[in-house]
Amino acid sequence: MTRKLFGTDGIRGTANTDPMTAEMAMKLGMAAGRHFTRGDHRHVVVIGKDTRLSGYLLEPALTAGFISVGMDVVLLGPLPTPAVALLTRSMRADLGVMISASHNPYEDNGIKLFGPDGFKLSDEDELTIEASMSNGLESCRVGSDHLGRAKRLDDAAGRYIEYAKYTFPRGLRLDGLKIVVDCANGAAYKVAPTVLWELGAEVIPVAVNPDGFNINKNCGSLHTETMREQVVAHGAHLGIALDGDADRVVLCDELGHMIDGDQLMALIGDLWHRSGQLKGGGIVATVMSNLGLERFLDQRGLKTIRTAVGDRYVLEHMRRDGFNVGGEQSGHIILSDHSTTGDGLVAGLQVLAALVQSGKPASEMLRLFTPLPQVLKNVRVAKGSVAEVLAAPAVEAAIRDAEAKLAGQGRLLIRKSGTEPLIRVMAEGEDEGLVEASVDAIVETIRRAAG
């Protein structure tokens, strides 16, 4: 049995259209609530969200579903995804819910679920919940005297702020550092600038005025132009860009040059190795990470384990094999000594600690290896047609041709997005011209096949 609703990062879609409707959210609340009402204690679910307008559609629907099966609901308001995971654990909740579509535009929304341990649910849990949504929900409603209750946690943001500061080494401060932080008009718009300011930095906030529509719009980790411009204009030491739910981060140095997740994993992995903190003898990355990262770590006697794309798969390998550093090139950085999921702010704080301790500028500290030329392009196709397009004879022929040209000189990766109707085409190799030509040829063929 395969999941139909749940993708690689929960349920996602265009808000107020199937499946991302209030009706679905209420059914999800009932089914997930029933699945996690084990034991005879009072059952609790915490719900956080980002700043999308449609959060007001989904939050009350989920709340109604949970209350109807006897679960108490604690509403956290706008908070980063890792904060929801943290509070699920610290409040001894049975379940955590984050309403967010991460880096997607405001029209989309999504729902991620966390178990009582703060980790994302297993495939098996998601399958069980999905099956329950299709049948048998009437029987799980409780009587009116056993309905759950809802309350808002007023100090939720403050709890996460204290936790984030706790991950920064004691005795260090950010005095004298000027930092631009782009919060994507998203979930971290209050907490990220506050954490940096409380640690002593001069903070230049960008995209901290959410209006329900501007999340990720020309800002955040996918649109870094403003952050880079502000870093150069203000003479800042570092730029930090988060995405809409702040579970991913990218940086730029004082010159405005970008630092992606691969460079961050190289830095943290190397530093933690030298300090004896690194576990597993290396890091866990995905198939999208640059070969330059692997070569850099190999030179230091460290291994690189690769997984399918998606932070859930990275985390699965980390937990199974005992690693404590992992992530994605896109900026999902998982530091399991601190978090149960990707945490952009906490990852950024580890980099800032390294900068303070070294006394070097970011341009010297954060570019540890030269990446091989890599080109990634996305092709949007009609929903539900990805497999059909990839199976088209012309597309298969274009892929075979590119593979033949890159043989021995690079690699090619074609995959469908787990969260959007996109086909991602990536090539990497020593010859930049060949890499770009290979990707362009496949992208053009996919576009023709998609009509």
Curated annotation (Swiss-Prot):
InterPro entries, sorted: A-D-PHexomutase_a/b/a-I (IPR005844), A-D-PHexomutase_a/b/a-I/II/III (IPR016055), A-D-PHexomutase_a/b/a-II (IPR005845), A-D-PHexomutase_a/b/a-III (IPR005846), A-D-PHexomutase_C (IPR005843), A-D-PHexomutase_C_sf (IPR036900), A-D-PHexomutase_CS (IPR016066), Alpha-D-phosphohexomutase_SF (IPR005841)
Residues annotated as the enzyme's active site: 102
Domain of life of the organism encoding this protein: Bacteria
Gene Ontology biological process terms, A to Z: carbohydrate metabolic process; peptidoglycan biosynthetic process; UDP-N-acetylglucosamine biosynthetic process
Catalytic reaction list: alpha-D-glucosamine 1-phosphate = D-glucosamine 6-phosphate
EC number(s) from the headed UniProt entry: 5.4.2.10
Cofactor(s) listed in the protein's UniProt record: Mg(2+)
Hydrolase listed as a keyword: no
Database matches in CDD domains: GlmM (cd05802)
Cofactor note text: Binds 1 Mg(2+) ion per subunit.
Residues annotated for Mg(2+) binding in this entry: 102, 243, 245, 247
Annotated positions of the Phosphoserine modification: 102
GO molecular function terms listed in the Swiss-Prot or TrEMBL record: magnesium ion binding; phosphoglucosamine mutase activity; phosphomannomutase activity
Gene Ontology cellular-component annotations: cytosol
PANTHER family referenced in this protein's UniProt entry, alphabetically: PHOSPHOGLUCOMUTASE (ALPHA-D-GLUCOSE-1,6-BISPHOSPHATE-DEPENDENT), PHOSPHOHEXOSE MUTASE
Reported function: Catalyzes the conversion of glucosamine-6-phosphate to glucosamine-1-phosphate.
Name this polypeptide is given: Phosphoglucosamine mutase
